[in-house]
Regions:
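Rossmann-fold dinucleotide-binding core
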Residues: 117-197
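Rossmann-fold NAD(P) dinucleotide-binding segment
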Residues: 75-135
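NAD(P)+-binding Rossmann beta1-loop-alpha1 motif at the extreme N-terminus of oxidoreductases
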Residues: 1-80, 108
């Protein structure tokens, strides 16, 4: 099976949708220049319910016209012409978009869901699309469209993942096969966000404190251990050593909180870290011999004895 769409529909024409449109419509892109004598030229169409509602909506329409993209503020029968639909609305509107598009889809059309949603929300979107005869593909965007445009890295999951990724990579995207289980790409992004947005919040708290103390440059230059082993391995090492050193680190965070308050910074994230470490201390899992466990062993101990929720 291979993909050869003639019409692509974009649901949502904000930062993501318009960036994808620019890539598809660029010189040398998927749409390319009209070919002489071609009775069925490749086309990009779009739907954005904010079209012409305000200054932003007016700008969306202007950009669509510049690119030669036929855009509408409503879900209309024009969607039935699309062989490939790319949904790039905000996560809270993903199901609404899927349900609005589903009755209009061409049978067998691929529906690429780029929305930031949970795995369960992805399942709801998928059921709406598949009930209408569409082929649902779960995609997690792992970078920003603002800097990367259509080349923002993506993880792709779904029953037709191989041909979809092959088509995407041949037409300007940067896509990677994750697997055949829809929802898994969305779940990867959600869990990754715990780290990335957490680091963002910590960075705000730490760097504001450092700047107020006049030591920002020095703090930024003392991250050599992270640079040396890479971020993912660094986080893994922290998890392993957390089993052994949670008590010492908990006490240290109490002093860190005091430092921030003395600097006039509310230790919001610091306080959460202190409570998180105290939770491990209270579980009493530190090994008597002080031996650092493997990552698998550490995760099992934390999951079974420290972190509740099920």
């Amino acid at each position: 099976m291979s993909l050869s769409p003639r019409v692509i529909a974009l649901l949502g024409f904000g930062e993501a949708g318009s960036a994808i449109a620019r890539g598809l419509c660029a010189e040398g892109g998927w749409r390319g220049a009209p070919r002489p004598g071609d009775n069925a030229p490749r086309r990009v169409i779009a739907v954005d319910t904010a079209l012409d509602e305000d200054a932003r909506g007016t700008a969306l329409g202007r950009e669509a016209r510049r690119l030669g993209v036929a855009i509408d503020g409503r879900y209309t029968a024009a969607l039935s012409e699309a062989d490939l639909v790319i949904c790039a609305v905000q996560g809270e509107h993903a199901l609404e978009a899927a349900q609005a598009a589903a009755p209009l889809l061409k049978k067998g059309a691929h529906y690429l869901d780029l929305c930031t949603v949970t795995g369960h929300m992805s399942d709801e979107d998928r059921l709406s699309i598949e009930a209408a005869g569409g082929r649902y593909i779960d995609i997690a965007v792992m970078g920003g469209f603002f800097k990367s445009g259509i080349k923002a890295p993506m993880l792709v999951a779904g029953a037709d993942v191989e041909p979809v990724v092959a088509w995407m990579n041949a037409n300007g995207f940067e896509a990677k096969v994750l697997g055949t289980r829809p929802g898994s790409a969305s779940s990867v992004k959600m869990v990754r966000s715990v780290l990335i947005k957490g680091v963002e919040a910590l960075g705000v708290e730490a760097y504001v404190t450092a700047e107020r103390q006049g030591i920002l440059k020095e703090v930024m230059e003392c991250m050599g251990d992270v640079d040396q082993i890479g971020f993912a391995k660094f986080v893994g090492t922290l998890v392993q050593t957390h089993i052994v050193h949670a008590h010492r680190r908990w006490e240290e965070m109490g002093l860190v909180g005091k430092t921030l308050r003395e600097t006039g910074v509310d230790p919001l994230m610091t306080g959460v870290i202190e409570r998180s470490h105290r939770r491990t201390v209270d579980a009493g899992i530190a090994p008597a011999d002080g031996k650092v466990p493997s990552l698998d062993e550490a995760l099992a101990m934390l999951s079974e004895k420290v972190i509740r929720g099920r």
